[in-house]
């Protein structure tokens, strides 16, 4: 993988230390106050720049929208080459005790080791896309000793949501603040395009529970097979999600309550990551269903944060399309992916880079001596 630079790691660790030395909620409150709406003038200027390029109007479809979103997020239609990074949040979920996954928490630890070595699928894809990778322990049941892992553990694994809350409210806030710290640290180090991924056995169960509560949907319809389940195991997983919601009675109007009762430390940290990106005016690429669940939590805490998020792909998990609709964000890729770790965002990056090459270097209608296309309303 493209390992995080010492500068980036130092900045992240300083921000994490600052967060842990503050009272729970202080960092979150400060960041929420800094998030302004995305720059609509920059968005309009980006669309105007696209229209000036000698190609059919809107010819690159969703990629033109993505570049315009990036322009709005950074506050300028001059979208230069940007350093990019993928932060991957590791956490264990107590709900695995209910048999909702075919593997246990030892796999989280094994993947953490492999990621530090640059040996996971997402690491290979990030290297191809030119992105640094930052592994973060926010809630692993058993940590690993590796200098490349950011240690920001809030608690050694979450509780079993089938029988009680995943964590305390302060624990959820702390995890959100870890994500804020990571995003702000990367931005301080000069990273201008951010992405987040996750790894934690059982997190498609927790994300389905959080999503079901926030969008007030039938929980069973949002539960998928995760890393692979038999029909019987899928039925059990659906029952577990329903039981978790019934047992904890999370408040749909309070995202932190929902995260603390039926979520996970990884989802909470990713929520904070998107808030930190928005506060830093750095566009953030979404990933799959767990990422979108975290993004919805961020948007419910601060609607302005939505303007800094860029969709990449639709996961094969059932909740994915529902979450994207709720966010109002397009996902250009629909490849049936469900890998996690930020892999979908990394698959999208080279395609985005190719569109950006056209945006920056494409010849204009004026330069080619061609008449520019005009916009017409439908029916005219």
Predicted regions and their residues:
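N-terminal loops that bind phosphate or other acidic moieties
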Residues: 2-380
């Amino acid at each position: 993988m493209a390992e995080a630079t010492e500068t980036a790691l130092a900045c992240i660790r300083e921000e994490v230390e600052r967060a842990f030395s503050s009272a729970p909620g202080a960092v979150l409150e400060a960041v929420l106050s800094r998030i302004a709406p995305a720059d609509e003038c920059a968005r309009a200027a980006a669309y105007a720049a696209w229209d000036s390029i000698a190609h059919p109007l809107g010819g690159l479809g969703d990629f033109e929208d993505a570049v315009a979103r990036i322009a709005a997020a950074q506050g300028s239609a001059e979208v230069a080459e940007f350093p990019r990074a993928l932060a991957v949040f590791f956490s264990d979920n107590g709900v695995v005790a209910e048999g909702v996954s075919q593997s246990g928490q030892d796999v989280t630890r094994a993947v953490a080791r492999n990621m530090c070595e640059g040996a996971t699928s997402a690491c290979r894809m990030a290297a191809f896309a030119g992105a640094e990778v930052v592994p973060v322990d926010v809630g692993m049941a058993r940590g690993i000793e590796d200098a490349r892992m950011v240690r920001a553990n809030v608690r050694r694994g979450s509780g079993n949501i089938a029988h009680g809350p995943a964590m305390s409210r302060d624990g959820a806030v702390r995890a959100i603040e870890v994500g804020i710290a990571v995003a702000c640290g990367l931005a301080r180090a000069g990273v201008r395009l951010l992405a987040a991924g996750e790894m934690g056995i059982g997190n498609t169960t927790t994300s389905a529970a959080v999503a079901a509560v926030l969008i007030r949907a039938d929980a069973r319809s949002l539960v998928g097979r995760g890393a692979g389940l038999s029909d019987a195991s899928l039925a059990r997983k659906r029952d577990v999600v329903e039981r978790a919601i019934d047992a904890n009675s999370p408040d749909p109007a309070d995202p932190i309550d929902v995260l603390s009762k039926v979520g996970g430390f990884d989802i909470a940290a990713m929520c904070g990551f998107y808030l930190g990106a928005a506060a830093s005016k750095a566009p953030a690429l979404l990933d799959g269903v767990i990422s979108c669940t975290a993004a919805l939590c961020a948007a419910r805490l601060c609607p302005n944060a939505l303007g800094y998020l860029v969709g990449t792909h639709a996961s094969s998990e059932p909740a994915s399309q529902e979450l994207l609709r709720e966010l109002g964000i397009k996902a250009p890729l629909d490849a049936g992916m469900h890998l996690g770790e930020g892999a979908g965002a990394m698959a999208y990056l080279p395609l985005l880079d190719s569109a950006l090459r056209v945006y920056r270097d494409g010849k204009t209608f004026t330069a080619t001596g061609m008449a520019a296309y005009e916009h017409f309303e439908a029916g005219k």
